[in-house]
Swiss-Prot record:
Pfam families: PRC_RimM, RimM. This is Ribosome maturation factor RimM. The gene is rimM. It is found in: Cytoplasm. GO terms for cellular component: cytoplasm; ribosome. The keyword rRNA processing applies. Belongs to the RimM family. The PRC barrel domain binds ribosomal protein uS19.
Amino acid sequence: MSSNQQPVVLGKLGSCHGIKGWLRITAYTDSVEGIFDYSPWLIKENGEWREVKVTQWRYQGKAVVAELEGVNTREQAQMLTNCEIAILPEQMDALPEDEFYWRDLIGCEVVNTTGYNMGIVDQIVETGSNDVLLVKANAKDSFGKVERMIPFVPEQFIKTVDVQGKQILVDWDPDF
């Protein structure tokens, strides 16, 4: 299964809430309640993904808690604490042709406008002003770099993104 076919992690199950099997939810979606737009969820338990359905959810103070189908006791819920919550990639909304998900950029080759291969996108970091590509440099990098941090600022630094071809063209000095 390719990385784009792997489940997309949207959050994590937290600690138990009460005695009836409710769990706190940590959501990585833009809005906390956005995680509940997807059903069913996949829960990674003991290294294996299994399908679960949310029967209900609510705000509990500043936290969000949910009841999962088949989880009726505190003991059952405790077994799920810290399990990842994911969905299948096909459950995600289709995007317009010129847009992409951050996960699609992981593994893309980064080349600058002079043709220099800067490396491969390893991860993306959110900052207050703009997101930043963490690019793992090639083993034989001419500038001795191990990693580069390139601000994801379209037009200024990011010239083109070719998700199908797995390549990002940047206007960035390889010595930075």
